[in-house]
Amino acid sequence: GMWSDRCTSKLGRRRPFIMWGALLNIVCLLVVGGSLFFQDSPLNAFFQSTFGVTASLAVLLLGIILLQFTSNISQAGQQGLIPDVVQEYQRGRASGIKSLMEMIPAALVLAISPLLDKKQFWLVIFILMAFYLGTMLWTVLSTKEVPLTEKPPRPAGRPVLRMLLLTVIFVGVTQLALWLVKGSARWLPEDTTALWLRVAVVGLVGLIGMAGSIFIGVYFGAQVGIGAEARSQKSFIWWVVTRLMFLAAIGSTRNFAMYFVKDVLKVPNPATITTYLTAVIFIFLLITSILGGYLSDKMGRKKLLAAAGVLAFIGTALLIFSRTIPMVMVAGAFLGLGTGTFMSANWALGTDLVPAKDAGRYLGISNLAGAGAGIVGSSIGGPMADYFNAIQPGLGYPVIFALYGGLFLISVLLLPKITKTSQN
């Protein structure tokens, strides 16, 4: 993102990164597919004795890790496109379309998953490669960027090192929060503490740990990542905080949904039911991602974000008390409505807030809201679910869903902190 802000290519600032990132993605997918050729490799003995894994798994891991780097090259470029080429009064609609297109891979996964069951791995890889190539060509050939005529000055300090330090801070704060949650569970003797008190205390510590790690991680991370400009970009920092609150909640709710269906509803086919739930969320998300973007241009971003948080909270509340499949699907509908509205309105607000000349750097920082969402929601929620499930089977999932509902509400309550809604 920082490098794309200063790119003077004739293609513009963003398209070179989108193009090369997508092409490198294809190379990495070939590495992933190539792992199949190492299944009976004579190198297995070396890899197993040295690293404890087979040669095939080592190549697979290498391809996946490299794919994280190359895909983020493309993502860094595409994130800066909307603030670069879309007028402010149309960014809600553009963000809605962006959210819609980002959901298509979820449908693609549902379509190609049966091919994996049939062991048609290379067909799956070629399909993914075709999508990377097709969407890259569509973007590069259809987008009209105005190239920079001269390279902007370098950001003060060492921005790459600042970004690395930002990541270390975020992970460290999250691990500290996890330690506090585990400690609160140990401080309450199981034989003398009532169950409701343990749920209340550990649950409250968990919510404070999640919300606190998000706030502290983003706040201090932004000081490091943005530098001296952070003092004048408080609205942007609060935007990242609210974004991470919501993404941590919805991502973790989705991740634990199958275990809830399996252990609480005790259905014989939890994977199938979870697929149906994902489809319901996807359908309602599609509806509101476009509509929400349009409405945010007309009504304002924060009003739509408040509605999104309330809808998602209702979805988690319904999920907690769901004991039938139809009720789970109704909960999924509310989660989809809230998520679609949030994704379009929130990104539109973010593109309004970032400085145009540094859009790549700022929106790159917001990537931590996506990556950090999984760290916060799952690393704290997972051990909490295990703790309560050990006390009473199935209890852990309603408890952590309640915490995720709390994050949805906190994301709404913090919206007034975003006092500036545009750089203009």
Predicted regions: what is each one?
Residues G1-L11, D117, T288-G300, A385:
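Helix-to-loop junctions at the C-terminal end of transmembrane segments
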Residues R6-L23, K298-G309:
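Cytoplasmic membrane-interface "Motif A"-like loop-to-helix N-cap segments
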Residues M19-V53, V310-R323:
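C-terminal ends and interior cores of transmembrane alpha-helices
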Residues T50-G63, S74, Q78-Q79, V85-G251, ...:
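Intracellular loop-helix junctions on the cytosolic face of multi-pass helical membrane proteins
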Residues L57, E88-I97, A271-T272, V354-N367:
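Loop-to-transmembrane helix entry/capping segments in MFS-fold secondary transporters
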Residues I73-V86, T341-P355:
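Intracellular juxtamembrane helix-capping segments at the cytosolic ends
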Residues K182-W196, N255-T272:
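Short amphipathic helix-loop junctions that connect adjacent transmembrane helices
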Residues S296, K302-A345:
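C-terminal transmembrane helical hairpin of 12-TM major facilitator-type secondary transporters
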